Amino acid sequence: MQGIGGLGHLGIQFARHMGFRTVAIGRGGEKEKLAKDLGAHVYVDTAVEDAAAALQRLGGARAILATAPSGDAMGPLVSGLGARGKLIVVGVPLEPMQLSAFPLVFGGRSIYGSLAGTAIETEDALAFSVLENIRPMIETVPLERAAEAYDRMIKGKARFRMVLVTKDGAAQGATVN
């Protein structure tokens, strides 16, 4: 899982509960405890080590879900895939991804993009979340400050999911950070 933000923190939980050996890739040592608390078996800190090399030391990834929208961070991950591995891009970077074609051609690796699932897939994901007690981490903001919350989200400053709350406290039941 590349990225431990709004999508990545959920992806780590899903992957772990689905029985996958889960590796979280982030930047900065302060994220390691969170990644492991969410269910990651291994945390790779890209501030101190090359993510692709770390993944290859672990045997090469069968799949990497790229959630943090950084083309500079995503492109090199192709080399961390095992043979016939897949890089699945869900966080859309503004800048292009730079990568070598060699690992794609000589390892049968591939890159896919995914925007959203079908209605049935969404229902299945929600049912699985309930069954496995997977919960989003949220940052709450009063409804009156919706414009500020939107601005933080657009600038990439939001941590996890932004949730607008009304005076009666709507947004009960989620984990608040």
Model-derived regions: residue spans:
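Helix-to-beta-strand junctions that scaffold the AdoMet/dcAdoMet cofactor pocket
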Residues: 81-82
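C-terminal hydrophobic helical "lid"/dimerization subdomain
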Residues: 17, 75, 119-177
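N-terminal Rossmann-like NAD(P) cofactor-binding module of classical short-chain dehydrogenase/reductase
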Residues: 62-65
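Short amphipathic alpha-helix with an adjacent loop that forms part of the alpha/beta core around
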Residues: 49-59
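Short glycine-/small-residue-rich Rossmann-like dinucleotide-binding loops
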Residues: 48, 68-69, 91-92
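Rossmann-fold dehydrogenase core element
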Residues: 86-88, 99-139
